[in-house]
From Swiss-Prot:
Task performed by this protein: Specifically methylates position 2 of adenine 2503 in 23S rRNA and position 2 of adenine 37 in tRNAs.
EC number: 2.1.1.192
Subcellular location as annotated: Cytoplasm
Species this chain originates from: Crocosphaera subtropica (strain ATCC 51142 / BH68)
Protein's name according to its UniProt entry: Probable dual-specificity RNA methyltransferase RlmN
Length: 343
């Protein structure tokens, strides 16, 4: 990417083999380098003990592409929110979400976000640039290193709109799958919807989970919540989602943040059900996490259950996802650079 320093992280085993050969080393060093980068997670080439000492010394300042943790907050449920400093000093956020059987990483795809969703803390902080493939992969390796256990799942639900950085996101998906060793079906790409990009993603024929942040079943309300929806009318968005299912053979997950008194009314549940009838899909209802910058409220339990029941009555597959890491300001929609607020 323009202006970004080339790093070893983000390269495939073939590319790494080409690189070591350019350095005058035998081809087998490429596989060694690949293993130490992606399986051992080294932060400096001097750590690669199988390399000749003299060569390691030559490479001591060569950029791998690893970030530094500048802050980590741990919630009572052991969710960890990280502020990571990139090579150019910009700060991004990453979240590690552990359970007894899983370790999920919520990765950022951009520094900030240009979509400016009305209820989201990240969008209030503006947008700076796209992340590189290496900067995305690094987030997973950093969380894996900090937890001292393998990452099992990755969700592209952190800072940024993944489909606005699709080239680097696709590269990161392939590296995470083929090089880090995470199954594609354990990777989730989420979007609020970007014209033409859903079908572009579909034609890559990935086996990832695809999630669309819907949040409203009528265009007027959706534009209020998601300003970018003005350029992507709901009927066209849903039509593209249906084409995605046809092309990939995989269902679409619809994320629906429940905002008390705004989009959680019974008639809105019926409206959503009608939009999705006959659709190969699943709905994730997410009770809102209040932020200082937006005047929305979390719905009560009765409203949540009522909305879920309406969808179930219409034979819509639905579940309620309660966000982890609330105490760490790390839950869905609350990702923002705390350092920016201090400056």
């Amino acid at each position: 990417m323009k202006g970004q320093e080339e790093t070893l992280l983000g390269k495939s085993v073939g590319q790494l083999t080409d690189w070591v050969k350019q350095q005058g080393q035998p081809a087998y060093r490429g596989k060694q380098l690949h293993q130490w980068l992606y399986q051992k997670g080294v932060r400096s080439l001097t750590e690669i003990s199988v390399f000749p000492k003299a060569w390691r010394e030559e490479l001591k300042d060569y950029p791998i592409g690893r970030s530094n943790i500048v802050h980590c907050t741990i919630a009572p449920d052991q969710t960890r929110k990280y502020l990571l400093s990139l090579g150019d000093g910009l700060i991004i956020e990453t979240v590690g979400i552990p359970t007894s059987k899983r370790l999920t990483v919520c990765v950022s795809s951009q520094v900030g976000c240009p979509m400016n969703c009305d209820f989201c803390a990240t969008g209030k902080g503006g947008y700076t640039r796209n992340l590189t493939c290496a900067e995305i992969v690094d987030q997973v390796l950093t969380v894996q290193e900090d937890f001292q256990r393998r990452v099992s799942h990755v969700v592209f639900m952190g800072m940024g709109e993944p489909l606005l950085n699709l080239k680097e996101v696709i590269k990161a998906v392939k590296i995470l799958n083929q090089d880090v060793g995470i199954g594609q079906r354990s990777l989730t790409i989420s979007t609020v919807g970007v014209p033409k990009k859903i079908l572009e993603l579909a034609h890559h024929q990935l086996q990832v989970t695809f999630a669309v942040s819907l949040h409203a079943a009528n265009q007027t309300l959706r534009e209020q919540l998601i300003p970018s929806a003005k350029s992507y009318p709901l009927p066209k968005l849903l039509a593209d989602c249906r084409k995605y299912v046809e092309i990939t053979g995989r269902r679409v997950t619809f994320e629906y943040i429940l905002l008390g008194g705004v989009n959680d009314l019974p008639e809105q549940g019926i409206q959503l059900a009608k939009c999705l009838t006959g659709f190969q899909s699943h709905v994730n209802l997410i009770p809102y996490n209040p932020i200082e910058e937006a005047d929305y409220q979390r719905p009560d339990g009765e409203s949540i259950n009522r909305f879920k029941s309406i969808l179930e009555e219409h034979k819509i597959a639905v579940s309620v996802r309660y966000s982890r890491g609330l105490e760490a300001n790390a839950a869905c929609g609350q990702l923002r650079a705390m350092s920016a607020a201090k400056n």
